[in-house]
């Protein structure tokens, strides 16, 4: 039976941090603020996968209060989510994720982002969709104060 999960994440943009999106380092004047690397796209994907298998959210496994996750790469979080899928006898069918940000443009980086997400989840890049949109200059996203991402995961689980 196919189970679906939805993930959403948002982080504030700050000076002095490296910007990571979909497991790829971006040249940008600001980075996302968070306890880990704050990769908003990978966090949304992680929550979608965990939600699809009824395993809570990223904070349940990697609480921001735990110092071991300080500046941790988000690929660790995705790998754990994939491990939980496998332990339950499931297989990830596909991931579809959208970044919401005014900048930077991600199109040239999408193949590398898909590869990074796929590697962390032990799936093919063909099973990963990544796209972006702006917030049409509206709200905190439009003012470039932060970035958001949403994701859907489809996972085939045994009956």
Q: Predicted segment positions?
A:
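RNase III-family endoribonuclease catalytic core
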Residues: 1-113, 120-121
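Glycine-rich, charged/polar anion/phosphate-binding loops
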Residues: 5-7, 136-139
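A glycine- and small-aliphatic-rich helix-loop capping segment at beta-alpha/alpha-beta transitions
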Residues: 18-20, 116, 144-150
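Short active-site-adjacent structural elements
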Residues: 107-108, 137-141
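Short acidic capping loops at alpha-helix termini that bridge into adjacent secondary structure
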Residues: 124-127
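Pyridoxal 5′-phosphate
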Residues: 130-134
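C-terminal edge-of-domain segments
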Residues: 141-159
